[in-house]
Amino acid sequence: MQTELLLDIERRTDYTFKYNSHFGRHGWLRLTPAYSVKLVRELIKKDCTENSNILDPFSGTATTGLVAEELGFNATLFDINPFLIWLGNTKCKHFSAGKLLELQQEFDNCMEDITLSENFWTPPIHNIERWWHPVTLEILASIRHKLASTFNEPNGNYYHNLVWIAFSRLIIETSAAAFNHVSMSFKSNSTQYEVSQIKLLFEAIFNRIITSAKTQLTGKAKVIKGDSRDLSAHGKE
């Protein structure tokens, strides 16, 4: 007779991505493999002394680096994913309140006049209409076209990157993707949004990001492109 061993393991959602959604910069984008702010804070407070320099060879969404900065530590993080390096360095950036105000005005001006067209670029995703309703997709593509002409494509301008992070959040929020569990699935139907609905949502997302970007960080963190299996080439970076 086979005996099954059942382990009563407590679920700690406070140690997962679910905990991060209301914590400023940590909630900019939801990536389900991320661990929580709470877990990193507990580990840093337990194991680090005043002059500790923190190393994270698997940066991911840069949770470790950002928490380190918030607690006044310096941190160096590594990753091989260009998107995560871009996202992590933007999240860990020290922003000027004055320049954020200028960015807010630039964004507001950009959103005043959006020209709709079916001819604007969309990503070459198979069965893309499973992700977005055709009407919604046209609106998103039109907004993206206007953003690219105003702020250029995502690059090393950390202020403009805030706009692109907000847009990334927008395309997730308006998609048919369901994130009610760790893996991703699709809702039965995509939603057709109006231009006014998408603009209001985008503005709300961007305003939240701008507000959290104003929070001053006391430490310093950076994400470097590197393979965690061999960091010797990076010396004492």
Predicted features along the sequence, with ranges:
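Conserved S-adenosyl-L-methionine
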Residues: 36-39, 43-112, 194-235
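SAM-dependent nucleic-acid methyltransferase catalytic core
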Residues: 137-237
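Hydrophobic (often cysteine-bearing) scaffold residues that line and stabilize catalytic clefts
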Residues: 32, 36, 84, 136, ...
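S-adenosyl-L-methionine
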Residues: 1-50
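Short linear capping/connector segments at secondary-structure termini
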Residues: 20-22, 121-126, 183-187
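Short amphipathic alpha-helical segments, especially helix-boundary/capping motifs
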Residues: 13-20, 62-63, 114-120
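Short, charged/polar micro-motifs that form catalytic or ligand-binding hotspots
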Residues: 26, 30, 78, 130, ...
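Conserved phosphoryl-transfer catalytic core
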Residues: 81-150
